[in-house]
């Protein structure tokens, strides 16, 4: 049943870290969860502008929020002397509608954006919006990822492909993709392409190889925390 489950959620706590790290009492849990949703949606809108691959939210015991934003355009995200980052934090406070909240945003550089599933999905979606062939867009993304060290890549595009009346799905896969194996280091992401014929959905799976030893799992989790 590995292919029926979100590969990210399937591996949280085993070979991947959670995207939200905090604890709250029952009376505050729903409030914190709603704030997390707003934060993720806020940075989702900035994904293409700053090439944001992931967002991790952490809270301390005083409920101060630290948001780790993984971006491939670190310089653009920070701006000159951090001015752009200050503007982003201020907009985020307005989105949360709570100016008293203590919130910090830390930017982390993505070393290999070609291997990031989210950025790959957005790249395919962007090419589809530019009226590029969905076949060429997928094959280009797959070749780029494999050339940069991925052991396997799978992509699917669904919708009114080439403007046909009936929606359908077409995808490509190269290399290994063991979604049912928890040791397999797999990243999964989705994106939306808004075209003249309607919305096209994009799904991307990127495999970075199988983790053989427990020490390797611990190393990946520690590296994920440092990123």
From Swiss-Prot:
Pfam families from the UniProt entry: KH_2, Ribosomal_S3_C
Domain KH type-2: 39-109
Keywords from the UniProt entry: Ribonucleoprotein, Ribosomal protein, RNA-binding, rRNA-binding
InterPro entries linked to this entry: KH_dom (IPR004087), KH_dom-like_a/b (IPR015946), KH_dom_type_2 (IPR004044), KH_sf_prok-type (IPR009019), Ribosomal_S3_C_sf (IPR036419), Ribosomal_uS3_bac-typ (IPR005704), Ribosomal_uS3_C (IPR001351), Ribosomal_uS3_CS (IPR018280)
GO terms, molecular function: mRNA binding; rRNA binding; structural constituent of ribosome
Cellular component annotations (GO), alphabetically ordered: cytosolic small ribosomal subunit
Family stated for the protein in its record: Belongs to the universal ribosomal protein uS3 family.
NCBIfam families documented for this protein: rpsC_bact
Record protein name field: Small ribosomal subunit protein uS3
Organism encoding this protein: Mesomycoplasma hyopneumoniae (strain 7448)
């Amino acid at each position: 049943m590995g292919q029926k489950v979100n590969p990210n959620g399937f591996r949280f706590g085993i070979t991947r870290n959670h995207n939200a790290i905090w604890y709250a009492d029952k009376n505050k849990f729903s409030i914190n969860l709603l704030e997390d949703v707003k934060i993720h949606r806020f940075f989702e809108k900035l994904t293409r502008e700053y090439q944001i691959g992931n967002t991790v939210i952490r809270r301390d015991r005083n409920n101060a929020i630290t948001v780790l934003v993984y971006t491939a355009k670190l310089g653009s995200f920070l701006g000159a002397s951090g001015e752009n980052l200050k503007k982003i934090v201020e907009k985020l406070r307005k989105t949360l509608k709570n100016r008293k909240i203590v919130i910090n945003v830390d930017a982390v550089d993505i070393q290999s954006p070609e291997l990031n599933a989210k950025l790959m999905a957005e790249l395919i979606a962007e090419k589809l919006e530019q009226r590029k062939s969905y076949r060429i867009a997928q094959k280009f993304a797959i070749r780029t990822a494999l050339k940069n060290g991925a052991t396997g890549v799978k992509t699917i595009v669904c919708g009114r492909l080439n403007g046909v009346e009936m929606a359908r799905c077409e995808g490509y896969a190269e290399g290994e993709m063991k979604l049912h194996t928890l040791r397999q280091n797999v990243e999964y992401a989705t994106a939306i392409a808004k075209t003249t014929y309607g919305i096209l959905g994009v799904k991307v799976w990127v495999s970075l190889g199988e983790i053989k030893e427990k020490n390797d799992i611990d190393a990946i989790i520690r590296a994920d925390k440092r990123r």
